[in-house]
């Protein structure tokens, strides 16, 4: 999984050395990536972010699912 190679700096700039690609992340994207790297499931990630943000579980699930799909499109997760 290429996501495990990703290095994120203090400005939320993510870099994947083997591909030579970089991405600008917002705070939520960085948090999701960090949680994925910790081995959290999608459902655990949704729960954590919903609790922190005060948004409904359903709304957060939709956003997290969309982000997971983007990670798949970019080939960062399977």
Task: Mark where each language-model region is.
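Acidic, low-complexity/disordered tracts enriched in E/D and polar residues
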Residues: 1-37
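Long, charge-rich, low-complexity alpha-helical segments
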Residues: 24-78
């Amino acid at each position: 999984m290429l996501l495990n190679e990703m290095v994120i700096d203090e400005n939320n700039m993510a870099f994947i050395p083997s591909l030579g690609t970089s991405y600008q992340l917002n705070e939520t994207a960085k948090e999701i990536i960090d949680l994925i790297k910790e081995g959290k499931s999608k459902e655990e990630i949704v729960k954590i972010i919903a609790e922190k943000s005060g948004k409904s579980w359903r709304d957060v699930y939709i956003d997290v699912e969309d982000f997971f799909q983007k990670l798949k499109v970019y080939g960062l997760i399977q």
